[in-house]
């Protein structure tokens, strides 16, 4: 198991999955038809919906303007159609329960291109993280641990300044920046499988396994506290089978539960406590 002290993570397309937001917003702004989305995105092998939409829009008249306008709307007014990538919350919980500090370091401008309403993209992102409970305190993140920068160069400087042992990003270009710190391990989030770099992972499930090869009682406690929004008094392992572990869980209120934990389900969207 790795023993990092500080982990940095990119935000857009690493923590936040914008694929559905791009589809919805492109249709809403009449840049794509529902028929085009249905016929093209279902057969897109190895290409994300975002990149397929980008390629199509850029091939049209006024493509650059339309694409940049679309980005601004997706990251601002329509960000509520995005999701948190499956497995991100688990990773944050695992870090928090082990005392590993996590920072989110993002290359994100204040405003989107051609947005006459001047919607703050940074405020929109913060609000989105709050609405998805990532800033609730249960995951070790707060507004003070999230940083935005206008350029990739300043983003890389912050990674070095914070002393990140690892940095997770979907863009290999970040790791190619001349001032990217040599002591920071590069982890590429690669959901479409288009890269073949060392330490490249298609899912957050795989990233979790890379960092954490075992589940601790403190992890189980964090799962229950986050799911029930109650303080946990004790967690004890009471038995195990080939594919699961069972725990006796007592809350501070005196309520007691039996929790069954499946190895794979600790990294997917199903409820962990049964």
Specify the residue positions occupied by each region the protein language model found.
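Structural motif
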Residues: 6-7, 166, 257
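Regulatory N- and C-terminal appendages and interdomain linkers associated
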Residues: 215-230, 235, 266-271
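ATP-binding glycine-rich phosphate-binding loop
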Residues: 226-251
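A conserved alpha-helical element in kinase catalytic cores
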Residues: 257-274
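C-terminal cap/substrate-recognition subdomain and adjoining C-terminal extension
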Residues: 100, 116-219
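Active-site neighborhood of HAD-like aspartate-dependent phosphohydrolases
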Residues: 2-65
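Short loop/turn segments at strand-loop or loop-helix junctions that form parts
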Residues: 11, 70, 104-110, 190-191, ...
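Short, acidic loop-to-helix structural element flanking the phosphoryl-transfer center
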Residues: 72-104, 120-123
């Amino acid at each position: 198991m790795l023993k990092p002290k500080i982990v940095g993570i990119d935000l857009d397309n690493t923590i936040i999955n914008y694929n559905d937001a791009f589809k919805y917003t492109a249709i809403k702004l009449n840049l794509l038809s529902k028929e085009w989305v249905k016929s093209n995105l279902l057969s897109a092998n190895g290409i994300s919906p975002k990149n397929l939409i980008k390629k199509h829009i850029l091939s049209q008249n006024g493509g650059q303007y339309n694409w940049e306008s679309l980005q601004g709307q997706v990251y601002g007014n329509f960000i509520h159609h995005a999701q948190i990538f499956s497995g991100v919350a688990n990773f944050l919980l695992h870090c928090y329960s082990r005392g590993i500090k996590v920072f989110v370091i993002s290359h994100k401008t204040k405003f989107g291109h051609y947005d006459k309403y001047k919607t703050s993209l940074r405020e929109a992102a913060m609000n989105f993280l709050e609405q998805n409970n990532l800033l609730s305190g249960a995951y070790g993140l707060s507004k003070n641990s999230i940083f935005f920068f206008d350029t990739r160069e300043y983003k890389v400087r912050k990674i070095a300044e914070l002393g990140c042992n690892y940095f997770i990003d979907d863009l290999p270009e970040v790791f190619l920046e001349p001032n990217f710190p040599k002591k920071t391990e590069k982890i590429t989030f690669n959901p479409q499988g288009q890269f073949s770099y060392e330490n490249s992972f298609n899912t957050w499930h795989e990233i979790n396994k890379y960092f954490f090869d075992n589940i601790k009682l403190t992890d189980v406690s964090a799962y229950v506290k986050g799911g029930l929004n109650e303080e946990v008094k004790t967690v004890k392992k009471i038995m195990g089978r080939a594919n699961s572990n069972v725990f006796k869980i007592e809350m501070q209120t005196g309520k007691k539960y039996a929790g069954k934990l499946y190895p794979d389900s600790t990294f997917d969207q199903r409820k962990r406590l049964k």
